[in-house]
Amino acid sequence: MSRATNAKTNHARHKKVLDLAKGYRGRNSTNFRIAIEKVEKGLQYAYRDRRAKKRNFRSLWIQRINAGAREQGLTYSQFINGLIRAGIELDRKILADLAVTEPAAFASLVAQAKAALDTTAEQAA
């Protein structure tokens, strides 16, 4: 009986890992034992950073909204509170885009938020 080596399977497995390691420096892309560690670590970073990306973009949007709102005389929290009271349901991504690309439209939203805050303040008094 001939010896079974699994050569085809092993070659395919090595090729898959080395293809994923393409572009790594030095032996990290050519040595299978090293490449498998680097590829695993790279996949861990990718998994982690797909989640971090969401947090980073949300904080970027909040910074942009805050800057746009402060130009109009409101803080971020006052602006968001005013939008909620006015019944305007725009997410932070859209608001940040408006603040950067359409300052006039964003200014009208700030005006509506201010008006909603003023009416609730009058009702409370």
UniProtKB/Swiss-Prot annotation:
The keyword Transmembrane helix does not apply. One of its GO terms (molecular function) is structural constituent of ribosome. It comes from the Bacteria. GO terms for cellular component: ribonucleoprotein complex; ribosome. InterPro entries: Ribosomal_bL20 (IPR005813), RIBOSOMAL_L20_CS (IPR049946), Ribosomal_protein_bL20_C (IPR035566). Keywords: Ribonucleoprotein, Ribosomal protein, RNA-binding, rRNA-binding. Pfam families: Ribosomal_L20. GO terms for biological process: ribosomal large subunit assembly; translation. PANTHER family: 39S RIBOSOMAL PROTEIN L20. Binds directly to 23S ribosomal RNA and is necessary for the in vitro assembly process of the 50S ribosomal subunit. It is not involved in the protein synthesizing functions of that subunit. Belongs to the bacterial ribosomal protein bL20 family. This is Large ribosomal subunit protein bL20. The gene is rplT.
